[in-house]
Amino acid sequence: MAKTTRSTGTKTQDEIKADGLKEKMISVNRVTKVVKGGRILGFAALTVVGDGKGGIGMGKGKSREVPLAVQKAMDEARRGMIKINLINGTLHHPIIGRHGAARVYMQPASEGTGIIAGGPMRAIFEVMGVHNILAKCLGSTNPYNIVRATLNGLDKIQTPAMIAAKRGKSIDEITGA
C-alpha cells in the first residue's frame, strides 16, 4: 500500500515482510550520469527498515530501474540495523543529532502525543516503534542527511543504567527515585 506523507508530498511505501520487519521507502531520485555518448539514466532509493521494538536500519541503493534500487536499499538497511533503547514507546531524554548541515532535535513526549515529526523522521519513528515523540529538522532538508542525523542522535541516547554505570552510582541515584 502506498500513501503520501503530509509534509513533503513524497511517496512512502510501507510494508511488513515475513521476517517481521517493517519497511518504508523514503525517497526515490532520478539521477543521470553524463558520458561521451550521452546520458545514462538511473535511480537512487533511500529506505528504512525497523522491527517495531527499537531496531532501525537505513539503506540506499542505486540501479537503472526503480525496483532494483529499492531492493538494494532494503537489503543494505537490513544488514546495517542498530538497536535503540526505548522507554514506553518514546526516548529517554532530549537529544540533538547532526550530519553535515542537517540538525535534528528529538524530545520524548507523554502518552497520547503521537509522532510529531516531518518527512523522513516520521518514517524512521514509525518503523522503529516510537509512538510518542516531538522532533524538528533544523538546517538541511535533504532526506539522506536528515535520516543520517536522526540515526546519529538516536545512537547517542543513553539509558539511566548506562549513565549510572559510567558514573559508578546506582540507578536510583541517577533517576532520583
UniProtKB/Swiss-Prot annotation:
The keyword Ribonucleoprotein applies. Keywords: Ribonucleoprotein, Ribosomal protein, RNA-binding, rRNA-binding. GO terms for molecular function: rRNA binding; structural constituent of ribosome. The keyword Ribosomal protein applies. It comes from the Bacteria. GO terms for biological process: translation. Residues 21-84 form the S5 DRBM domain. Part of the 30S ribosomal subunit. Contacts proteins S4 and S8. With S4 and S12 plays an important role in translational accuracy. Located at the back of the 30S subunit body where it stabilizes the conformation of the head with respect to the body. The N-terminal domain interacts with the head of the 30S subunit; the C-terminal domain interacts with the body and contacts protein S4. The interaction surface between S4 and S5 is involved in control of translational fidelity. Belongs to the universal ribosomal protein uS5 family. This is Small ribosomal subunit protein uS5. The lineage of its organism: Bacteria, Pseudomonadati, Pseudomonadota, Betaproteobacteria, Nitrosomonadales. The gene is rpsE.
